[in-house]
Swiss-Prot record:
GO molecular function, one term: zinc ion binding
Native source species: Xylella fastidiosa (strain Temecula1 / ATCC 700964)
Name of the gene this protein is made from: metE
Residues where L-homocysteine binds: I436, G437, S438, E489, D604
Residues binding L-methionine, per UniProt: I436, G437, S438, E489, D604
Cofactor(s), by name: Zn(2+)
UniProtKB keywords: Amino-acid biosynthesis, Metal-binding, Methionine biosynthesis, Methyltransferase, Repeat, Transferase, Zinc
UniProt name for this protein: 5-methyltetrahydropteroyltriglutamate--homocysteine methyltransferase
Cofactor note (record): Binds 1 zinc ion per subunit.
């Protein structure tokens, strides 16, 4: 019988139970025991769901209260000194302090840096290491969760982040080489593997996703060294797991490593199948990632079955496992909850639970079970209906794309001329202050939105409520002394969803939540067809906010690349083409904002770097169409209109030329968690336009001191001319409270005033 396995399951719960449990605990409403009870219930539910879906070997230790990379650092005692006292006194509080920071009980701790998990929209906490790092086992989470499942009668395969990937995903605070710590780390892995074997684990999934990256000779040698040592001690069988792309030139390396099985991504790396089959060592299991773990479209089961049969013919039925391409962390839990979704589109989709069923169908078809044919036929019909649907293809969009010319992507004049025109119009002081866009979405705001959507609040009453919140926001910014204001975005539930709801070609789920980080969940739109803007989307609220103040008001848009990256994107055409469609829709919106008297327009692109292909050789093509799309959206304005963009969680050193090519008048970037490290890019590259390096971290509730911000601004001033510098937070303030927001922004304005006075 063909084995069905899974690499990871969504943690948050079908109805975001984990989010609610975490936030209740952080507010002090529940204790650690209650939080852990919810966690155990979720794990049990998910293991049973996978078992009932026909998964023969589900994972364990894929669950986390916040982040699996943080879990790994915590497990191996890679805890920075500043957290030691709290961790020793209260491990769970210390764990959350590492994730979120802590400012209470005379404790003032920064959180660990956060960054994107490869090219996904999931964020992980970056472990901090140093040359004298000591590793030791702290707790027994992987063993405890394996035994927890076993007590339910379910045998699982524990998941570990592999030692080399763990080090490569970390940072050293003293500039030392991360891989030099391998010899210190491996004994702890060896100890853990031995304990897992003693607990009865037959297999361990050891994730080394960095195997799909460009690796230098030193890193390749680190892999060889690591697995040679892990192979010496008693251990369970190891499933070496790669995902997010083909192994490419690391295939030979992966096959040299002494593992008992190899998982490959056959969705993003279809082309690697022949090479793997021709070189897979005798006796080694092949886990074939045939179902897309990152997107929500139904699998072409005929195509997947063809690959599976081909693989089975080479390795034999007993050595072939069927799996998703990667962990299902990146997709919603269950499509069955979406009762009100357009029936046609719904029939084209598969969420985590349905993807497991697809794998079972493939396994049954491989085993020649007749019941598989019904599901195969249903899938064929759904895919054909999608190909033929008029909901997907619009001739007017194709015509507009064909009419694009180089002039579509150019401003009227170069930045030096535009900046003079803008300063004449806006009359801003040195070190102008602004925010990134959103202001706190309080419980009252969320409740009013929910009441409006459920019909309990009339449209006129809801609009009156939003106007009052917007005016409060504008008055608060004026009182604080900010120079360029925003309207607060109280009408918006999400920076992508808000726009997608107003664009043809997008559709939204009700419960299609996925984890972004910690308790932060997002509900990505689904781009199922050609994108068109039927009517203005933001003009009414921006114009209203501008009518309340004489100060410049920023129009706030989400950029085309970010809308693409943060959506589930159609897989029947190139991503670049979909991005250009979104850009044209935004171009129309930008023009309407300018006509309405909005002189500053921000087009956020926080996701531009995460769209980079994992292999550097593929970067140029992506950056070309990403930059082109931004310029399509932003170039149809007068010189006096100032175009801003915002980017967060980004490293710019290697894409600084592309960032400059966007030709935004002002960019704001996330820099505070990295203590302005991102500005290193500007030492070698003379960035031509204005820039606002974020001076405080909005992902943490702590209010920074004025001196901290002044120091960061002085660091920025050492790299950039003062006339190019803006002063702003790292990101939007949606998730913060009003009290801390007001205090932090007041401190920020005072910091800017100090620099002006020097």
């Amino acid at each position: 019988m063909t084995i069905v396995t899974n690499l990871g399951f969504p943690r948050i719960g079908a109805r975001r139970e984990l989010k609610r449990a975490l936030e209740s605990h952080w507010r002090g409403e529940t204790d650690a025991t209650q939080l852990q009870h919810t966690a155990r219930e979720l794990r049990a539910r998910h293991w049973r769901l996978q078992r009932d879906a026909g998964v023969d070997l589900p994972p364990s230790n894929d669950f986390s209260l916040y982040d699996h990379v943080l879990d790994t650092a915590f497990l191996f005692d890679a805890i920075p000194q500043r957290y030691r006292g709290l961790v020793d006194a209260d491990p769970l509080a210390g764990y959350f302090a590492m994730a979120r920071g802590r400012q209470a009980d005379n404790i003032d701790l920064h959180a660990l840096e956060m960054t994107k998990w490869f090219d996904t929209n999931y964020h992980y906490l970056v472990p901090e290491l140093h040359r004298d790092q000591h590793f030791a086992l702290r707790g027994n989470k992987p063993i405890a969760e394996f035994e927890e499942a076993l007590a339910l009668g379910i045998t699982t395969r524990p998941v570990l982040l592999g030692p080399v990937s763990f080090l490569l995903l970390s940072k050293t605070v003293d500039g030392s080489n991360r891989l030099d710590l391998l010899e210190r780390l491996l004994p702890v892995y060896t100890q853990l593997l031995r304990q897992l074997q003693e607990s009865g684990a037959e297999w361990v999934q050891i994730d080394e996703p960095t195997l799909v990256l460009d690796l230098d000779a030193q890193t390749q040698q680190a892999f060889r060294k690591a697995y040679a040592i892990l192979n010496q001690g008693p251990r369970p069988k190891l499933l070496l797991t790669s995902y997010f792309g083909p192994l490419g030139d690391n295939l030979e390396l992966a096959l040299q490593l002494p593992a008992d099985g190899l998982h490959i991504d056959l969705v993003r790396g279809t082309e690697q199948l022949d090479a793997v089959l021709n070189t897979l060592p005798a006796g080694r299991v092949l886990s074939a990632g045939l179902v897309n773990g990152r997107n929500i479209w139904r699998t072409d089961l005929d195509n997947a079955l063809t690959m599976a049969r081909y693989a089975q013919g080479h390795v034999g039925a007993d050595r072939l496992w069927l799996a998703p391409s990667c962990s299902l962390l990146h997709v919603p839990v269950d499509l069955e909850q979406e009762k009100n979704l357009d029936a046609d589109v719904r029939n084209w989709l598969a969420f985590a639970k349905q993807k497991l069923s697809e794998l079972r169908v493939l396994a049954d078809a491989l085993d020649n079970k007749p019941e598989a044919e019904t599901a195969l036929t249903q899938t064929r019909q759904a895919l054909e209906a999608r190909r033929q649907s008029p909901k997907v293809h619009r001739p007017d969009v194709a015509q507009r794309l064909a009419a694009l010319t180089p002039d579509t992507t150019r401003r009227n004049t170069a930045y030096p001329q535009r900046s003079q025109a803008q300063q004449h119009t806006l009359n801003l002081p040195a070190y102008p202050t602004t925010t990134i866009g959103s202001f706190p979405q309080t419980l009252e705001v969320r409740e009013a939105r929910a009441q409006f959507k459920s019909g309990k609040l009339s449209e006129s009453d809801y609009e009156a409520f939003l106007k009052a919140e917007t005016e409060r926001c504008v008055r608060t910014q004026e009182e604080i002394g900010l120079d360029v204001l925003v309207h607060g975005e109280f009408e918006r539930n999400d920076m992508v969803e808000y726009f997608g709801e107003q664009l043809d070609g997008f559709i939204f789920t009700k419960l299609g939540w996925v984890q972004s980080y910690g308790s932060r969940c997002v509900k990505p739109p689904i781009i199922y067809g050609d994108v068109v803007r039927p009517a203005p989307m933001t003009v009414t609220w921006s114009a209203y906010a501008q009518s309340l103040t004489d100060k410049p008001m920023k129009g706030m848009l989400t950029g085309p690349v970010t809308m693409l990256q943060w959506s589930f994107v159609r897989d029947d055409q190139e991503r670049a083409q979909t991005c250009r469609q979104i850009a044209l829709a935004l171009r129309d919106e930008v023009q309407d904002l300018e006509k309405a008297g909005i002189k500053v327009i921000q087009i956020d692109e926080p996701a531009i770097r995460e769209g980079l292909p994992l292999r550097r050789g593929e970067w140029a093509d992506y950056l070309n169409w990403a930059v082109e799309s931004f310029r399509i959206a932003s170039s149809n304005v007068h010189d006096t209109t100032q175009i801003h963009t915002h980017m967060c969680y980004s490293e710019f050193n290697d894409i600084i030329e592309a960032v400059a090519a966007l030709d935004a008048d002002v960019i704001s970037i996330e820099t505070s968690r990295s203590r302005m490290e991102l500005l290193d890019a500007f030492v070698k590259f003379r960035y031509p336009n204005a820039i606002g390096p974020g001076v405080y971290d909005i992902h943490s509730p702590r209010v920074p001191q004025e001196e901290e911000m002044v120091l960061l601004l002085k660091k920025a001033r050492a790299v950039l001319p003062p006339e190019q510098l803006w002063v702003n937070p790292d990101c939007g303030l949606k998730t913060r409270g009003w009290k801390e927001t007001r205090a932090a922004l007041q401190t920020m304005v005072h910091a800017a005033q100090r620099l002006r006075a020097e």
